[in-house]
Each structure stands twice: as structure tokens, then as C-alpha cells.
Amino acid sequence: MTENNEHLALWGGRFTSGPSPELARLSKSTQFDWRLADDDIAGSRAHARALGRAGLLTADELQRMEDALDTLQRHVDDGSFAPIEDDEDEATALERGLIDIAGDELGGKLRAGRSRNDQIACLIRMWLRRHSRAIAGLLLDLVNALIEQSEKAGRTVMPGRTHMQHAQPVLLAHQLMAHAWPLIRDVQRLIDWDKRINASPYGSGALAGNTLGLDPEAVARELGFSRVTDNSIDGTAARDLVAEFAFVAAMTGVDISRLSEEIIIWNTQEFAFVKLDDGYSTGSSIMPQKKNPDIAELARGKSGRLIGDLTGLLSTLKGLPTAYARDLQEDKEAVFDQVDTLEVLLPAFTGMVKTMHFDGDRLEEEAPTGFALATDIAEWLVKNGVPFRHAHELSGACVKLAEGRGQELWDLTDNDFIETFAAFLPADKAPGVREVLSSHGSVDSRNGKGGTAYGRVREQIADAKAEVEELKLFPASTSDGSAYKAPGTF
């Protein structure tokens, strides 16, 4: 398109001069907010129709306005229209483009009844709602990859750890599902957050509302919102919902980082629990033997970045008075960075998880070591009438005895158990403790709800699958149940 490169500002009538070059450079935001252009054009269409319903645009003017906005959208899509150096923000750039197409008289009418304050507050909500659905879909892909690995793991037992020390044997599937559930909760948080952000600030004006008879409810419906914000000041200035999204993104990063840490450890030569697919690993520029878990390491590193975005945003918001202040321009880069990070990270991370190969023999071999069956001894003693305080001490005595000999618990003799338990159990009963001295026996005994017994793990996998089926509706719909429409399709 032929661009009008003449400087256009959305303010200035009471000023005797334009902004200084230094102020213009500081104020400029098109380098990051241009990504809101599609949402802005969609919002402008809805606003134009509101102006038409209010009698502020004739039917002919409304048609020409919509045609001009369609043309502007095409030019944005094909790259023939873009911001220029003088454009303060994406709203300024798009108004310049609209006036270039529709003319100054018609193009200049679109701003009636709309402030950049309510405009940008609505656009960031639209953008985040759309991308939250994309992120939710990517998270569910990762959950499904963990479920698939859990199903493949079957009855494989591994050493469960607390404080990074051997604790108790658990099913590998149980360990993997322990990472699936937090990710499911991250999706649930996005869905819950969407209920609150599903309100349009359009019609709030600068802060006090509008006097032109516009219909904010109609605009809200056209833009995929189920309602309008209840307070015009809150509508223009509230960024708690942006911060809430930033928290969910940061929490997602933390949940992924914790899984990354385990994968990195499991992938070491010392552990050798898992091998990563070549397609999801990297090498060294100098050491030919290296096969590095870069995706897991990058995920761990990027979690700090996601947390930093949240912290920076909260620091910006904490000192602001009520109503709009220019500081709020700083809300966007934080969440833009988070979305960009997650939308690149999650597909790579899911691919790594999906293609991991676990060494079942190695896991089974390590599962009962490190005196991991000591708790089973204590619980066996309790079942045989020994108070737990004493059972705990007796099990600890068995550990001390085995450790002193450089043995494992199952290496102790019947006489060892008879002598250790003599004050509480008859000699003929003490050797019966051997029935719990196997990792599979230990796992199978933990069959309460949420436990690591095979049947319970199968149960939780089924529950997770059902939850995913319900949650996957979110990426394809708005919170009010209607089909979510991408910008430009209203």
C-alpha cells in the first residue's frame, strides 16, 4: 500500500510543540506492541459497529470503515503496512494506516468514544486469552507424553528419593505421574484465570466511561467476552489479571524445571536411568563423547527467566495509584516474553519426554538399595503388634547392622532378625519379615488411594486421561462455551 508517512499523534491539541526526540524514543513501543495489531483491528471493527448503532456513523460510513479495516488487515498480514519511526505505538500506526485508506474525515471518526486506556486494556486481555489457549494445548501435549511413558513403564520399580537420598521403592510410572499432575493444575489455573479475565474494558474510556451512547456489551460479545468490566477505572488500570497470568506462566516454568532436574540427574553416567533420543540431545564442540541434555537444561534455565518476568511486573505494579499511568506500558513485554518462551520451549520439551528411553533393569536393580526397605520393616513390625516408636528403632537397628557389614537389609540372617526383635517377637515369627524385603512387595503393599501400588497407579493414569479429555476443550473454546474466534474473523 502507499503509506502516508506524515507524523500522526493521538494527542497534542494543547501543546505548542511536538515531543522531543528523547521523549519520542522513550515512549516508542511499536518494537514490542505491534503483535497486538490483529487484536486492535478486530477491536476497531467492533467499535465501528458500536458507533454505527449509536448513530455516530451512517450505514454508508460504517460499510466504508469496515472495508478500510479489512484492507488494513490484509496489508498488515502481507507486511506491506508496518510501523514507521514516528509511530508512538501500534494504535498510532494503525490509525495512520486507516486514515491513509479511508481518508482523514472518515478515519478520524473511529477514535470517538474510545481511549487508548480502555483500548490497550482490552487488547492485552484478548491477546492473553488466545495465547493461554495455545499454551494450555501445549501443556496437555506434555501431560499426554508423561502418561504414555507411564503406561510403557508398566510395573518397573525405581528408587524413590527424599532429600536426594534413597527413601522407598516406587513405580517409575508413579514418579512420572507425579510430574503430570502439577502440569494439569497449571492448565486448570489458566482456565480459572480465564473466568476472571473474560470481561471487556471497552467503553471505560480514559477512566470514567463514555457519554456517546455506545453499547459495551455488544462490543464485548463481538470480541469473545461474556461480560463487561464492572468499574471503568478498574477496567482501564487493573493489571492484576496480567500478573496472574504471569504467575501461572512462572509456575509452569517451575514445574517443568523440577522435571528437568530429574531428567538431567537420571541421564548422568552415575545414575544411567534414562537415555535421551539423539534428536533431542546435543554434542560438545571439543569432547566427541558428549551427549548433553540441553533441552532439560534450557528448560531449567528459562524457568528463572519466567520468574524474572513475573517479579519485574509485580515490581512495576506495586507503587501505582488508582487509574491509568504510563508505567502500565511495561506490563506487556513481561508476558510477551513468557508466552514466546513457553511456546518455543514446550514442543521441544514434549518431544524429549516422548522419546526418552528408561533402563528398566538398572532401575529395578537400584530400587531396593540404600536400605530403601527399612520403612517396610517398621510397618511389618507394627502389623505384628509392635508400637511404631519401637518398630522405628528396631528397623534402624537392622540398618545399622547391615551398614556395618557393608550389606543390604535382605543380606541379614534369620538369626540377625531374631536377635534384633527378641524383646518384641517370638523367635519363630521374626524371620517372617523377609516377606517385605523386596521392592515389588513394598510397592504392592502401598495400595491406598494415591499410593504407588500398580492398581492404584493404573487408576490415577485413567483419572489423568479423563481430566485431559475435559481440559482439552479449553484450547478450542471460551469460558462461556462459545467457539473461540481468532482476531480478524468476527
Curated annotation (Swiss-Prot):
It is found in: Cytoplasm. Keywords: Amino-acid biosynthesis, Arginine biosynthesis, Cytoplasm, Lyase. It comes from the Bacteria. Pfam families: ASL_C2, Lyase_1. Coiled coil: none annotated. CDD domains: Argininosuccinate_lyase (cd01359). PROSITE patterns: FUMARATE_LYASES. The keyword Magnesium does not apply. Its EC number is 4.3.2.1. It is an enzyme of class 4 (lyase). It catalyses: 2-(N(omega)-L-arginino)succinate = fumarate + L-arginine. GO terms for cellular component: cytosol. GO terms for biological process: arginine biosynthetic process via ornithine; L-arginine biosynthetic process. Gene3D superfamilies: Fumarase/aspartase (C-terminal domain), Fumarase/aspartase (Central domain), Fumarase/aspartase (N-terminal domain). The keyword RNA-binding does not apply. Belongs to the lyase 1 family. Argininosuccinate lyase subfamily. PANTHER family: ARGININOSUCCINATE LYASE. This is Argininosuccinate lyase.
